[in-house]
Amino acid sequence: MAEADTERRPHIPVLLRPLLAAVAPVEGTWLDGTFGAGGYARGLLEAGADRVIGVDRDPLALEMASGWAGDYGDRLRLVAGTFSQLDSHAGAPLDGVVLDLGVSSMQLDLAERGFSFQKDGPLDMRMSQEGESAADLVNTASEETLADILYHYGEERASRRIARAIVEARAAAPITRTLALAEIVARCLPRPKPGQMHPATRSFQAIRIAVNAEFSELVEGLEAAERALRPGGRLAVVTFHSLEDRIVKRFLQLRSGGEGQGNRYAPETRADAPRFTLPLRRAISPDEAELAENPRARSARLRVGVRTDAPAGKVDPQALGTPLIPKKGRR
């Protein structure tokens, strides 16, 4: 039933219109590194792209696209993989790259994927359906590691209290369901007032980021885009929370020749020859009309860079303010 519900509910790509305006003219070959339900890929094709390569590590996303992808013939090619390797998926210099970060509405709406703290399902959260699940992490990580994950990846101030509660709960029985974990977290925090976010929001974000190695994937993906784009090619990134937006902002700032101001994770840094120019003075946020249509877009930010002809290079993740959590083992 969940799958049918998702098929009836149209996916709304966030900030699509301002993204297409910011990267215009849309032409040549583009790569959508987070294909999902295909909203950005279709938007790019309809805006004038000759060809789009859609990449996703979620096999369900590619399976669900099989019903309509053929309508575009050889203009749309789907690839199972991660955007951290997007340059290897491209095969030739690209005219543009689009990344829509974080968990998709499609994944949130399917309870069996285990991303939602509002729907009961197995505690999974894996985008690729491979490797360690959220249940594996929650039931085996040490209390100190859990606290670090919650604090650094979720900016959760009550991280130690929540980590302690998780360890105490799993001692009685393994934590295997999303609502069970959400209840454990909620008991550690004040009851939210009307309009405030669910108390488990930050904790679920943090665990999801850890399970999917989202920050290392993002840094490697930005580097891969730098390698793959031709001079004049566009990089457009849509973020949904402050941590990933900070990484993208700092990457574009440093790669455009600016100086990083530093933060609690990174020192001040001076960049080499500019690899990007910045056509937007600041990030673009959804307007009121888009928020009325899609409330989930509220935290979205769009940033755009235009590739120069300077050689691509490696970037120090710490220079981007990427939170690094030491491996402290299991319980």
Swiss-Prot record:
Gene3D superfamilies: Putative methyltransferase TM0872, insert domain, Vaccinia Virus protein VP39. One of its GO terms (biological process) is rRNA base methylation. Residues 287-331 are annotated as: Disordered. GO terms for molecular function: rRNA (cytosine-N4-)-methyltransferase activity. SUPFAM superfamilies: Putative methyltransferase TM0872, insert domain, S-adenosyl-L-methionine-dependent methyltransferases. It comes from the Bacteria. S-adenosyl-L-methionine binds at G38, G39, Y40, D56, F83, D100, Q107. One of its GO terms (cellular component) is cytoplasm. Belongs to the methyltransferase superfamily. RsmH family. Specifically methylates the N4 position of cytidine in position 1402 (C1402) of 16S rRNA. This is Ribosomal RNA small subunit methyltransferase H. It comes from Cereibacter sphaeroides (strain KD131 / KCTC 12085) (Rhodobacter sphaeroides).
